[in-house]
Amino acid sequence: MSKKLTFQEIILTLQQFWNDQDCMLMQAYDNEKGAGTMSPYTFLRAIGPEPWNAAYVEPSRRPADGRYGENPNRLYQHHQFQVVMKPSPSNIQELYLESLEKLGINPLEHDIRFVEDNWENPSTGSAGLGWEVWLDGMEITQFTYFQQVGGLATGPVTAEVTYGLERLASYIQEVDSVYDIEWADGVKYGEIFIQPEYEHSKYSFEISDQEMLLENFDKFEKEAGRALEEGLVHPAYDYVLKCSHTFNLLDARGAVSVTERAGYIARIRNLARVVAKTFVAERKRLGYPLLDEETRAKLLAEDAE
């Protein structure tokens, strides 16, 4: 029987595969976020006319999902392997299935289903046509064609493939608990992450200072606005991410009512929309540097008319 891939070998295999498809290998973005989609490497780059092919691992924090390290499949923080390709290759689904083969999962020997699940992220004004990918009855990937990001229509269309690494590793290694996953030879997932899982859960549900978080949300929102007034897209977006994580902490603590919840989401969404518009305008001002010369000249000429 062949040796099963460790967690880090799964990452390395996916990195090599998508590198071979001309994706840039980016690194995780250094702000808390609830999903790889919220990284500027996806959120900002999915809008505007410039091409963008990237792949990266993104630790994703969801305070309300914390379970003190006691639930085998529910986590405060999990890891996503994110692939974004713009424009979307016509064979993106075939490429995805090929990536599974590289991980030792033969599509002809397993029940792999694309289950329609259109995607929406209200807090960033984003939506798209989507599918969950189920492997022998377990969801392992979200597949999305973005239609709107930051309130802006996308064009060309960006394809996003988001692998749930813990689920994928649990399947490949045939373990029932995420904490039994072998991260590297001789080192279990739980030996690395069960302590922070417990501590972050305790903090999110019991210890966090609600008043401080409420004040921070207001301050982060204001600072994002100040940065946008100066045309500083990336600092502004950092504060949008801080607003989002702060809201998630408040939500986990039960500090916001149903009515207030909608209001906070709208405030984050409004900021995200301004960030998106400002980013596109700034890329245009720079002359769309990632476009080829012919397309750039044509677009800039059309915009000038």
Curated annotation (Swiss-Prot):
Pfam annotation, one family? tRNA-synt_2e
Please, one GO biological process term?
glycyl-tRNA aminoacylation
Does the keyword field hold Hydrolase? no
- Return the Gene3D superfamilies for the record: Bira Bifunctional Protein, Domain 2, Class II aaRS and biotin synthetases, domain 2
Cellular component, GO, one term = cytosol
Source organism's superkingdom? Bacteria
Query: What molecular functions are annotated in GO for this chain?
Result: ATP binding; catalytic activity, acting on a protein; glycine-tRNA ligase activity; transferase activity
Q: Is Nucleotide-binding given among the entry's keywords?
A: yes
Q: What CDD domains would the database entry show?
A: GlyRS_alpha_core
Compartment annotation: Cytoplasm
Please state the protein's primary subcellular location. Answer: cytoplasm
Enzyme Commission designation: 6.1.1.14
Q: Where are the transmembrane segments?
A: none
Give the keywords, sorted. Aminoacyl-tRNA synthetase, ATP-binding, Cytoplasm, Ligase, Nucleotide-binding, Protein biosynthesis
| Catalytic function, reaction form | tRNA(Gly) + glycine + ATP = glycyl-tRNA(Gly) + AMP + diphosphate
State the family named in the UniProt similarity comment for this chain: Belongs to the class-II aminoacyl-tRNA synthetase family.
Quaternary arrangement and interactors, per the entry?
Answer: Tetramer of two alpha and two beta subunits.
> Which PANTHER family does this one have?
GLYCINE--TRNA LIGASE, CHLOROPLASTIC_MITOCHONDRIAL 2 (PTHR30075:SF2), GLYCYL-TRNA SYNTHETASE (PTHR30075)
Q: What is this protein called?
A: Glycine--tRNA ligase alpha subunit
| Originating organism | Streptococcus pneumoniae serotype 4 (strain ATCC BAA-334 / TIGR4)
